Amino acid sequence: MDIRNEFLQFFKNKGHEIYPSMPLVPNDSTLLFTNAGMVQFKDIFTGMVPHPSIPRATSSQLCMRAGGKHNDLENVGYTARHHTLFEMLGNFSFGDYFKEEAILFAWEFVTKNLGFKPKDLYISVHEKDDEAFKLWEKFVPTDKIKKMGDKDNFWQMGDSGPCGPCSEIYIDQGEKHFKGSEDYFGGEGDRFLEIWNLVFMQYERSNDGILSPLPKPSIDTGMGLERVQALLEHKLNNFDSSLFVPLMKEISELTSLDYASEFQPSFRVVADHARAVAFLLAQGVHFNKEGRGYVLRRILRRSLRHGYLMGLKEAFLYRVVGVVCEQFADTHAYLKESKEMVMKECFEEEKRFLETLESGMELFNLSLKHLNDNKIFDGKIAFKLYDTFGFPLDLTNDMLRNHGACVDMQGFESCMQEQVKRSKASWKGKRNNADFSTILNAYAPNVFVGYETTECFSQALGFFDSDFKEMTETNPNQEVWVLLEKTPFYAEGGGAIGDRGALLKDDEEAALVLDTKNFFGLNFSLLKIKKALKKGDQVIAQVSNERLEIAKHHSATHLLQSALREVLGSHVSQAGSLVESKRLRFDFSHSKALNDEELEKVEDLVNAQIFKHLSSQVEHMPLNQAKDKGALALFSEKYAENVRVVSFKEASIELCGGIHVENTGLIGGFRILKESGVSSGVRRIEAVCGKAFYQLAKEENKELKNARILLKNNDLIAGINKLKESVKNSQKASVPMDLPIETINGTSVVVGVVEQGDIKEMIDRLKNKHEKLLAMVFKQENERISLACGVKNAPIKAHVWANEVAQILGGKGGGRDDFASAGGKDIEKLQAALNAAKNTALKALEK
């Protein structure tokens, strides 16, 4: 049975509109990931947006529960039903039907469509919800309905806001399989399994905790697809269902192990985590040191550790991820489209961690031998695993689980000190919903006329302070928000900053417009008051002249994305952008740095489209039609049924609500300033065009002229080479005196950092000066750490030593027994590399 389709069609026949699964990254500052089906309807439930014309909805929502408040990561693999990624089937009513219909629909679907026997079904209700109890009595015997307290059967969105009792449907999986002391209805065992939760949103909880009835009660339900699939197939574990068979087969082929072996938990961890990695990467989340990217990294590293347990010492997860992309291709087409990119990024991340995994495991296993009687693992070692070898703390705890041990958290935290808290996110969200409830009830969306004009007559509908409390009048020097009846000011969005400008009253400048933002469908402009304004005043709204420069950079961004896809491949997709009047910044998915040739091609392609003077075209069409035409869209964006499409003939076509130039010739010229890495799998290009392009060329010509004067040579290359040779000769004079030199058992040990000079020549001079030597010198150059090491009459090989330390820096080394060099890009790990280099030298001399 196709449970997903069966569910959606059932509720469609009951008058519900089918909504697609929203992205795993929600536009909600309170959530790390989308963790429930109701997330995309949150603004409807809280009254921030009007109820849709069809007040019934249904969806099959992809959810993530790893990191943040809802975190199942540590349980995955060890329980029958926990997942990091899963699908939640749900039906929703926005002030339409309530308890009676919700219970009727649920019972009908469970017993008729899914075919579960009524005798096996049990119900829980809130202890004070007599109404739900009586409704359920129509379908099940009273002794199979259990009243429970707030902990189990009361749901609320937060400390305040919509809330209400809930009712859950359980199924008895049979006494023969479950005979534990907790395997009774209401116990903690697995015999009675919850399959569906019906939330009856009928109250509003105030800030002081008082419950008031909602004028229009609503329904929010959730049922796990993976759990239902297992039940229908009479499986006692979600991972034993047909949904996971293709993944288990792939893991079995990779490991030459049987799923039913002692490694079953590891099979399940890898299968689950492969699904999460595939979907997160395909939806634009990339491996990072913080926020969502760090959660993704933790998931991958946990799966690699379980692969290591099964004997896999090389990258393997990317192959399981590839199976996930194929498995879900029919229902989530973007997975198949991005399969190559997803597998490649996964492979590169695996390689990085595998370089330190084995060394980290050796340290872990060695430390296990010194566990104290209380089974407390040294917090300092846990921190070293975290800081030097990239082992997330939860991974170390997961490894300790089988030994009945745990990390000394006090010791770990003391070592952490001022380290960046990696699991903290840095994402933008909306303002507090409570700020806007009264405003939304009082005002209709204002009219945006900025596509047609940069100036218009308007009326000030209202003024608001920084907390969005309404003001009737304003005074000079105040900063306030204004809501205009109609506005030419474009609100920040699509990477473009909000418009600035001025408000005129009686032909005088009454206020400066500092910024414009959209909150829940209303365009607000931030004002600096110069002349007192009050509610109802007639004003002239004028957009500043910088609007044209912003438009140039916005259109150039579209051309840039098109050029990147042509040069690098169709896997390139936007991962973020910033469009200002003097520059643009574009983040995109790509696994490695662009070389000079690629950057030149991209820049040339953009300028070629500029010189063609291509006219822009704006169309409005259904979303599916736009995608059929090849329009590029942001995966994380939630689009309406009808969308705005901006195209520059054959050069570019994108879904976009922003301001653009009428033809590409107005952009003037385009110049890439910098290409860099943002995080694993994400690159960034910074560029200028228009006036900023001209100003840059002017400044560079001036600098070149001054350089020729300083070098006293019109041939700049020759002059620079002559200067470099002079500097090089001066640096050969001596080894920097600040390099620490210790003598241990007759051997000179030098480990340190220099800011300038040729570190290879320094090693040569040290070797000439000392009879016995172990030396490693580090130097930071741009975004990279270089090192050189020399060994003379000492019990260690230089190339082994260099490679070991380079791995900490995220790089590799090579060379001879007496000399080697290496480098890496992980600048933050310099101190850890210094410590490791010193420790290796000391241990070698202690033997």
From Swiss-Prot:
The keyword tRNA-binding applies. PROSITE patterns: AA_TRNA_LIGASE_II_ALA. Gene3D superfamilies: 2.40.30.130, 3.10.310.40, 3.30.54.20, Bira Bifunctional Protein, Domain 2, Threonyl-trna Synthetase, Chain A, domain 2. Coiled coil: none annotated. Its cofactor is Zn(2+). Signal peptide: none annotated. The keyword Nuclease does not apply. CDD domains: AlaRS_core. GO terms for cellular component: cytosol. This is Alanine--tRNA ligase. The gene is alaS.
